[in-house]
Amino acid sequence: MNDRKQLEAIEDAHLAPYAMRAGKSVGRAFPEAEHEYRTCFQRDRDRIIHCAAFRRLQYKTQVFLNWEGDHFRTRLTHTIEVAQAARTIARALALNEDLCEAVSLAHDLGHTPFGHAGEHAMRDLMRDHGGYEHNGQSLRIVDELERHYQPRFPGLNLTHEVRHGLMKHVTDYDKPLFKGLTTREGPSLEAQVANFADEISYNAHDVDDGIDSKVLTWQAGRKSELFAEAEAFARANVPEGEDDLLRYQVVRRLKDLQVSDLLAHTARRLKEEGFSDVRAVLAYEGKEPVVDFSPAFKAKVKGLKVMLFNELYMSRTVRRSMEKVTRFMRQMFERFVSEPYLMPGGFVKRIEQRVRTHRVVCDYIAGMTDRYAKEQYKKLFDPDVW
């Protein structure tokens, strides 16, 4: 049997010198005895999977509202796809797969219901009350809001490396605040991989959901050079008339193209930098990222994002749903701020303990699923629901 020490020895033997190692973790804020047959990063992964915030992701919107279709991505299915991509990339680069997976699984825990429209609404509502950003909220969840291990410690007591990875997880939608959670260290390579696994996943699966919903047309997709390239490859390998199979193959090709370019360019960058150990990675201050797409391919990815923004995210169908969502999130927020006793007792208790009301209301609403938020809205404002 491979116990923890043997697993750590396997990491030492097979990972690159610049990869994070469980056996050299900085540790946890609240010291704990090590597990017999799991490394600290494997233990973090398991804690994330078993926490309530992770389960709630299954009823949180990615692009299309949860009740609009059974096959559209939710935050949970997106998260699983990100973790899978991160492990694949980490394995190819001889990085720590378990750390990449743990960061990937936790990266969206702090998202509000109703996708990016919900996050934008919450940012506006919290603008003068300490701010809101979903990466910072993910850290609040794993550090404070999850209650599985009280009274031993608040939150999940994750390792420094996983928390650091969440702090450094930045996408085009994010402008991290992280007040009181800053660090001078740069991101680990594993954190950078999780970041790109997120981007690769939503670039591909938003195309999948968009075409499946018929909001995104094939003609519109071809405005992206990368989409057109993936479609040409798929059509050469799929029989005429097999539209679903064609869509699947386009999405697969989009993922393959992104991962292949990322691996090739990152391998070149690692060779150029010649990092001797993890400390060199964390101290890196170069202008050119280490984990990245090649410049030419990055332009293609940007074109794909522009197409998705114009043709899918800003489509009448998606905007109509999101505008409605924004309106009722604001109404709920304002009602709970003015009458906080309408929230569950645990949240009221936090206000009594002098946690700011706006922050508590933010925590409550950000933790809601689409379905629960819809039910709470009805209870607050529908005279026929009690």
Question: What is each stretch, according to the model?
Answer:
Residues N66-T77, A90-R91, A106-P113, M126-H129:
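Short coil/turn segments at secondary-structure boundaries
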Residues D108-Q150:
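A generic, well-ordered mixed alpha/beta core segment in the N-terminal half of proteins
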Residues E36-Y37, V103, G130:
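Short N-terminal signal/transit or membrane-insertion segments
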Residues L93, E97-E119, S138, D198, ...:
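His-Asp-centered metal-binding catalytic motifs of divalent-metal-dependent phosphohydrolases/nucleases
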Residues M1-T79, A83-I89, N96-E97, N135-G136, ...:
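Histidine-centered, transition-metal-coordinating active-site segments
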